[in-house]
């Protein structure tokens, strides 16, 4: 990647229904003609596929295991965690405004970073020696400014 360019967030690609739906290849309940909880319903409720009966919201990082009779939208809305997708409440992409789309994409990027930082903290806390911790910290990119002040003023 060229210097100064930013990698697109992994979760931002799930802003739209069609992209979330594409993640459901072998969703178990799609084979059940009586199931209310289909891949279409789960994707429409804001989830991408994480397993044969589960999905994760790109906008609140909530992962749920579903039953065939579940209503994915209801299950999503009854969770305590605040979710931007639930707050906006538009299950049809054609109803999303540009502002809605930007907010969802930004939220997905923030949630990706939050998840990455939580994973890094968990990994760091699992290291027992200070040498192992130091090795992990060396791998973290330095985001602090490295420019020096050109001020000629005295102290």
Curated annotation (Swiss-Prot):
Q: What's one GO-annotated cellular component?
A: condensed chromosome
Tissues/organs with expression:
Expressed in oocytes and sperm.
As for subcellular location, the record says: Chromosome; Cytoplasm, Cytoskeleton, Spindle; Midbody
- What biological-process GO terms show up in the record? chromosome condensation; chromosome segregation; egg-laying behavior; inductive cell migration; meiotic cell cycle; mitotic cell cycle; mitotic cytokinesis; mitotic spindle midzone assembly
* Alphabetical list of InterPro entries matching this protein: Baculoviral_IAP (IPR051190), BIR_rpt (IPR001370)
User: Where does the record place its BIR repeats?
Assistant: 20-87
Name the residues that span the membrane. Answer: none
- Phenotype reported upon loss of the gene: RNAi-mediated knockdown results in high embryonic lethality. Causes a failure in cytokinesis resulting in a lack of cellularization and in polyploidy. Defective extrusion of the polar body during oogenesis. Defects in chromosome condensation, compromised alignment and segregation of paired homologs and defects in spindle midzone formation during meiosis and mitosis. Disruption of air-2 and hcp-1 localization to chromosomes. Decreased phosphorylation of histone H3 'Ser-10' and decreased acetylation of histone H3 'Lys-14' and 'Lys-9'.
Q: Does the keyword Protease apply?
A: no
Q: Which Pfam families match?
A: BIR
Annotated Zn(2+) binding sites = 57, 60, 76, 83
Q: Which keywords does this Swiss-Prot/TrEMBL entry list?
A: Cell cycle, Cell division, Chromosome, Chromosome partition, Cytoplasm, Cytoskeleton, Meiosis, Metal-binding, Mitosis, Zinc
Look up the domain of life of the source: Eukaryota
Q: Which PROSITE patterns match?
A: BIR_REPEAT_2
GO MF annotation: an example: metal ion binding
Gene3D superfamilies attached to this UniProt entry: Inhibitor Of Apoptosis Protein (2mihbC-IAP-1), Chain A
What family does the entry list? Belongs to the IAP family.
Q: What does this protein do?
A: Component of the chromosomal passenger complex (CPC), a complex that acts as a key regulator of chromosome segregation and cytokinesis. The CPC complex has essential functions at the centromere in ensuring correct chromosome condensation, alignment and segregation. In the complex, required to direct the Aurora B/air-2 kinase to chromosomes. Also functions in spindle midzone formation and in the formation of polar bodies during oogenesis. Required for the localization of the kinetochore component hcp-1 to chromosomes. Involved in the positive regulation of transcription.
* Subunit text: Component of the CPC complex which consists of icp-1; csc-1; bir-1 and air-2. Within the complex, interacts with csc-1, icp-1 and air-2. Interacts with csc-1 in a zinc-dependent-manner; the interaction is direct.
What protein name is recorded for this chain? Chromosomal passenger complex protein bir-1
The taxonomy runs:
Eukaryota, Metazoa, Ecdysozoa, Nematoda, Chromadorea
User: Corresponding gene?
Assistant: bir-1
């Amino acid at each position: 990647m060229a210097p100064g360019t930013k990698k697109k967030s992994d979760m931002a690609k799930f802003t739209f229904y069609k992209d979330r739906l594409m993640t459901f290849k072998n969703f178990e309940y799609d084979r059940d003609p009586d199931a209310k909880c289909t891949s279409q319903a789960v994707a429409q409720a804001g989830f991408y596929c994480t397993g044969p009966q589960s999905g994760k919201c790109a906008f609140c990082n909530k992962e749920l295991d579903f039953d065939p009779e579940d209503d994915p939208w209801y299950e999503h809305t009854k969770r305590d965690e605040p979710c931007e997708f639930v707050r906006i409440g538009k299950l049809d992409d054609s109803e999303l405004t540009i502002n809605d789309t930007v907010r969802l994409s930004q939220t997905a990027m923030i949630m990706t970073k939050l998840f990455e930082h939580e994973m890094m903290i968990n990994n760091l806390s699992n290291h027992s020696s200070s040498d192992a911790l130091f090795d992990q910290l060396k791998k973290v990119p330095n985001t602090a400014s490295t420019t020096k002040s050109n001020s000629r003023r005295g102290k």
